[in-house]
Regions:
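Residue-level detector of flexible, active-site-proximal loop/helix-junction positions
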Residues: 111-112, 149, 225, 254
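Thr-Gly-centered strand-to-loop micro-motif
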Residues: 108, 143-145, 167, 190, ...
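Membrane-anchoring hydrophobic helices of lipid-metabolizing enzymes
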Residues: 3, 8-118
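Non-catalytic C-terminal accessory region of glycerolipid acyltransferases
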Residues: 2-30, 170-296
Length: 296
């Protein structure tokens, strides 16, 4: 009798343990479902903001810039006004990305440009890099690709703000030197295109030539994403599986004059500065670990 009662007690205890044990498959499915829902929601938000950006660009080209030009005839004053407007719009746009939980953003060191007439250079991993910088650099002048000047959604803002257009290498250097001499702060991506999927930053020498010939202060900025977002070959409508953390950091300013030592030529100094920047980005752009958080 005692043996029978003991066996029954053991069965009851085993049954309780089986009920208490977690169900890993079910939990994994719920986590996967939650992650999928989060990605779908962020993809919808991403498409929505693309539509908003397109509408804003169309309004800038067809309404804002033409009307503003009627009331502000002076070209310099008009450009400053449009650039201030761009500053507030890009801040609002990036703020909307944060509110919609498309990105987590950490910014440091780029809101205090060393002096007027400086050159800000940054790596270019994503389509939103220019927005990230323009939203933190008041009156910044972007060096834009020529294709954006004829794009119906961007030409109004580029022409109204009098941004520099990268058409011809020599004329670009001359134009940038003139802008820097006039006290404008330029924002330039030395890669001239978004970073390739292998993550290697391949710099061209244009930025170095501008800095060396202008003898202007150069502020290097690093832009890092924990997850690929709007990269060179990604689908614009599909958000990453995990919400990206974005880190934008301004580093110690560089004096281009130090690369002109030993009476070297401007071309040699530009090569030295380009190599210095290449090593700088190779060292600073380590793999960014995403923060620990729950499903998104």
């Amino acid at each position: 009798m005692a043996v029978v009662l003991s066996e029954r007690a053991e069965r009851v205890e085993i049954g309780r343990e089986q009920q208490i044990q977690p169900q890993p498959r079910s939990t994994g499915r719920r986590a996967s479902l939650s992650s999928g829902i989060g990605r779908a929601a962020r993809s919808i938000g991403q498409v929505f903001l693309f539509a908003v950006f397109g509408l804003y660009g169309a309004l800038m080209s067809t309404l804002v810039v033409p009307v503003y030009s009627v009331f502000v005839r002076d070209r310099v004053r008009r450009a400053h006004g449009i650039r201030r407007l761009m500053y507030h719009i890009t801040r609002t746009y990036i703020g909307a990305m944060r509110v919609l939980r498309l990105i987590d953003l950490e910014v440091s060191g780029i809101d205090r440009v060393p002096s007027p007439g400086s050159l800000i250079v940054a790596n270019h991993p994503s389509l939103i890099d220019a927005l990230l910088l323009l939203g933190h650099v008041k009156d910044g002048v972007v060096v834009a690709k020529r294709s954006l000047q004829v794009n119906p959604f961007t030409w109004g803002g580029i022409r109204g703000a009098n941004y520099v257009v990268n058409a011809d290498p020599q004329s670009l250097i001359d134009e940038c030197r003139a802008r820097i001499a006039a006290g404008e702060t330029l924002v330039l991506f030395p890669e001239c295109t978004r970073t390739a999927d292998d993550g290697v930053v391949r710099l061209r020498r244009g930025a170095a030539h501008i800095a060396v010939r202008s003898r202007c202060t150069l502020l290097p900025v690093t832009i890092e994403f924990s997850e690929p977002l709007l990269t060179k070959n990604s689908r614009w409508w599909l958000a990453p599986k995990v919400r990206p953390s974005v880190r934008v950091r301004g580093h110690a300013a560089i004096d281009p004059g130090q690369f002109l030592k030993d009476d070297c030529s401007v071309s040699l100094a530009a090569r030295r500065l380009t190599e210095h920047l290449r090593e700088f980005y190779s060292d600073k752009l380590k793999v960014m670990e995403p923060p620990r958080r729950g499903p998104t």
